[in-house]
Curated annotation (Swiss-Prot):
Transmembrane segments: none annotated. Pfam families: AA_kinase, PUA. GO terms for biological process: L-proline biosynthetic process. It comes from Bacillus cereus (strain B4264). InterPro entries: AceGlu_kinase-like_sf, Asp/Glu/Uridylate_kinase, G5K_ProB, Glu/AcGlu_kinase, Glu_5kinase, Glu_5kinase/COase_Synthase, Glutamate_5-kinase_CS, PUA. Disulfide bonds: none annotated. ATP binds at K9, T168, D169, T210, G211, G212, M213, K214, S215, K216. This is Glutamate 5-kinase.
Length: 367
């Protein structure tokens, strides 16, 4: 089997004991299976939940806290305990681990996003095993990923993974809740995440079973858009992750056909950047951008909405108001208002400008 880059997401339900804390037996089982992947020459990134579960009892909570301050306090204590447990287990296999704690703002800020990309690349080149969790102890509720499922999808795209494995306590996706319906049909393979599949998931306590299944389907859809194949399921034993790569996993495979990966810069624009304004374009410019892959030139701009600076991300809309994409603008809003509708040869050179493109195609994503 050829060397692959794999992101494995392990949720709290796959780590917890009967009291809601971390099961050392479960953790050891996961580490042994991850070590087998490394032994076979694969590159591995681990996305792990479990900080709250690892820390709540040490703070005297009788059960997992439900308040934000309680969860964040438990995560602050539990993250170091969780990382210590992983490090000690991986040391038995001679594997060096590295900890990365990420927040949503690390993805929305271009420089931090690029730094995360460079750091992960260097760690993998050095044969280390990055262990990533959301920085739950400081994350603002409105700025979180929502869960580690989406974090795992975004990381899998960032590192250009071949596969994302989302491990949970349910062995795949079903058309009904298998715990309540004996005739529930399991999906062994889905070529894509359709609206029908998304609607089956619904919200917590919906048709597909556990409350976390919707987030897993949303994560799968995001990963697929970034060119990463997905597995959602469960398993035990040292061979469980290797079996997934061999097509023998106990779960559902989603979109395992080869797809074109999205470059790091375009991932940031598409999924993480904050939009600072809008540019309205005529029909000819819209066709040139979408159908022919051209850059946006000032001649095609009909209106500029908002206030933005050079390098900030803007939406591009048609004259009917339909959003067709977004990209990094090489003009400020003030500059663009001065030159909109003008031919490139008629625009006076401003400062050190070497290009007249409003948005270069390398810094554009269609929506």
């Amino acid at each position: 089997m050829k060397k692959q880059r794999v992101v494995v997401k392990i949720g709290s339900s796959s780590l917890a004991d009967s009291h809601g804390g971390i099961s050392t037996e479960q953790l050891s089982d996961h580490v042994a299976a991850l070590a087998r992947l490394k032994e076979d020459g694969h590159e591995v990134v681990l996305i792990t939940s479990g900080a709250v579960a690892a820390g709540f009892s040490a703070l005297g909570y009788p059960s997992r806290p439900v308040t934000i301050k309680g969860k964040q306090a438990a995560a602050a204590v539990g993250q170091s305990l969780l990382m210590q447990a992983y490090t000690e287990e991986f040391r038995k296999y001679g594997i060096v681990t590295a900890q990365l704690l990420l927040t949503r703002s690390d993805f929305s800020r271009k420089e931090q996003y690029s730094n995360a990309y460079a750091t992960l690349g260097e760690l993998l080149n050095r044969s280390a095993l990055p262990i990533i969790n959301e920085n739950d102890s400081i994350s603002l509720e409105e700025l979180t990923f929502g869960d580690n499922d989406m974090l795992s999808a975004l990381v899998s795209g960032l590192v250009s993974a071949d596969m994302l494995m989302i491990f949970t306590d349910v062995n795949g996706l079903y058309d009904k809740n298998p715990q309540k319906n004996a005739d529930a049909k399991k999906y062994y393979f889905l070529p894509e995440v359709t609206e029908e599949i998304s609607s089956l998931a619904g919200d917590a306590g919906s048709k597909l079973g556990t409350g976390g299944m919707k987030s897993k389907i949303d994560a799968a859809k995001t990963a697929l858009s970034l060119g990463v194949s997905v597995f959602i399921g469960t398993g035990r034993g040292q061979e469980k992750f290797v079996d997934v790569l061999k097509g023998k996993g106990d779960g559902t495979y989603v979109g395992n056909a080869p797809q074109k990966e999205m470059k790091m810069n375009k991932q940031w624009i598409a999924l993480h950047s904050l939009v600072s304004g809008q540019i309205e374009v005529d029909a000819g410019a819209a066709t040139a951008i979408i159908q022919h892959g051209k850059s946006l030139l000032p001649a095609g701009v009909t209106n500029v909405l908002g206030f933005f600076q050079v390098g900030e991300v803007v939406e591009v809309v048609t004259q009917q108001g339909r959003v067709i994409g977004k990209g990094q603008c090489t003009y400020s809003a003030e500059e663009l208002r001065d030159v909109k509708g003008m031919q490139s040869q008629d625009i006076q050179v401003r400062g050190e400008r070497h290009s007249y493109e409003v948005i270069h195609r390398d810094h554009w994503v269609s929506l």
